[in-house]
UniProtKB/Swiss-Prot annotation:
PTM notes: O-glycosylated on the hydroxyproline residues.
Keywords, alphabetical: Cell membrane, Glycoprotein, GPI-anchor, Lipoprotein, Membrane, Proteoglycan, Signal
InterPro entries per the UniProt record, alphabetical: AGP
Localisation per UniProt entry: Cell membrane
Induction trigger: Up-regulated by AHL16/TEK.
Propeptide: 113-136
Signal peptide per UniProt: 1-20
Function in brief: Proteoglycan that seems to be implicated in diverse developmental roles such as differentiation, cell-cell recognition, embryogenesis and programmed cell death.
Annotated region (Disordered), positions in chain: 24-115
Major place of residence: membrane
Name this protein carries in UniProt: Classical arabinogalactan protein 11
GO biological process: pollen tube growth
């Protein structure tokens, strides 16, 4: 009974490792073809432009502090989140002697299901070897 438990545990571990290796990483990876996207730096505030505490301007609520809108979707001036613009092929410049831009580059080629099938075959082989070893 203990052998069966060990074999099933090895099989589960092998299959789990295969699928964990195919899962995307939680950490973002830097793409060598794209420029890094950083948030724009805020302009430094000068002390002359900042209102003083005794100034009547400082006591009035600013438009950012106005919470009269029920929700951001009700306000027409609500900030929206947008993705950075997609890179255009013209931005890199046309390359007459390079590979054509019709298909993905070698570094950008999508993974096929064949990789997963090979890994599952290896996991099955490990499981079969485990069954054989622990059945002796």
């Amino acid at each position: 009974m203990a052998r069966l438990f060990v074999v099933v545990a090895l099989l589960a571990l092998a299959v789990g490792t295969v699928f964990a290796a195919d899962a995307p990483s939680a950490a973002p990876t830097a793409s060598p073809t794209k420029s890094p996207t950083k948030a724009p730096a805020a302009a430094p505030k000068s002390s002359a432009a900042a209102p003083k505490a005794s100034s009547p301007v400082a006591e009035e609520p600013t438009p950012e502090d106005d919470y009269s809108a029920a929700s951001p979707s009700d306000s027409a001036e609500a900030p929206t989140v947008s993705s950075p613009p997609a890179p255009t092929p013209e931005a890199d410049g046309p390359s007459s002697d390079g590979p054509s831009s019709d298909g993905p580059a070698a570094a950008e080629s999508p993974k096929s299901g064949a990789t997963t099938n090979v890994k599952l075959s290896i996991a099955g082989t490990v499981a079969a070897a485990g069954f054989f070893i622990f059945s002796l």
